[in-house]
Curated annotation (Swiss-Prot):
CDD domains: Cygb
Protein name: Cytoglobin-1
Family, per entry: Belongs to the globin family.
Cited InterPro entries: Globin, Globin-like_sf, Globin/Proto, Globin_lamprey/hagfish
GO molecular function, one term: superoxide dismutase activity
Pfam families: Globin (PF00042)
Coiled coil: none
A GO CC term assigned to this protein in UniProt: cytoplasm
UniProt-listed Enzyme Commission number(s): 1.14.12.-, 1.7.-.-, 1.11.1.-, 1.15.1.1
Function, as annotated: Probable multifunctional globin with a hexacoordinated heme iron required for the catalysis of various reactions depending on redox condition of the cell as well as oxygen availability. Has a nitric oxide dioxygenase (NOD) activity and is most probably involved in cell-mediated and oxygen-dependent nitric oxide consumption. Under normoxic conditions functions as a nitric oxide dioxygenase (NOD) but under hypoxic conditions the globin may switch its function to that of a nitrite (NO2) reductase (NiR), generating nitric oxide.
């Protein structure tokens, strides 16, 4: 059963990252990225198990129901690596707002135009990222670090939503994002 949208509403409000938050995000990410393949797969499997409607955008594995089978999917692993590399680029670029904007713009455009992904899934994915990282890295994802990540993911969601709006995304008025 899919969760209610309200669980990720805190991702609709963002503010600029502080220097301290940037450092916490980059330090924590360095630890997570050491296991980027496993972390990425865990994130996507959790997304697809808890929010099965998110699989509709992936013809290669949208009919796979079993979590273990999803984990073994080479296509899922490939996409998980792409997601983790995009997050890595974002985190590495936190000191360069132009680069951050460029990355988020490219991701937003690709998902709106080419993949036609409803922008609400960025909020959902962000919530899943926070959940999985908190469970997998409890010593790293302290409350303060999780708060910094929440702010970064809110920036991501707001920026991508702005890209969708700029493109005149036809479903935005119907979306809960």
């Amino acid at each position: 059963m899919e969760r209610k949208q309200g669980e990720v509403d805190h991702l609709e409000r963002s503010r600029p990252l502080t220097d301290k938050e940037r450092v916490m995000i980059q330090d924590s990410w360095a630890k997570v990225y050491q296991n980027c393949d496993d972390a990425g797969v865990a994130i996507l499997v959790r997304l697809f198990v808890n929010f099965p409607s998110s699989k509709q955008y992936f013809s290669q594995f949208k009919h796979i129901e079993d979590a273990e089978e999803l984990e073994k999917s080479s296509q899922l692993r490939k996409h998980a690596r792409r997601v983790m590399n995009a997050i890595n680029t974002l985190v590495e670029s936190l000191d360069n707002s132009d680069k951050v904007s460029s990355v988020l713009n490219a991701v937003g455009k690709a998902h709106a135009i080419r993949h036609k992904v409803d922008p609400v899934y960025f909020k959902i994915l962000s919530g899943v990222i926070l959940e999985v990282l908190g469970e997998a890295y409890p010593q790293v994802m302290t409350a303060e670090v999780a708060s910094a990540w929440t702010n970064l993911l809110a920036i991501l969601c707001c920026s991508i939503k702005a890209v969708y709006e700029e493109l005149g995304w036809p479903h935005l008025s119907n979306s809960t994002s």
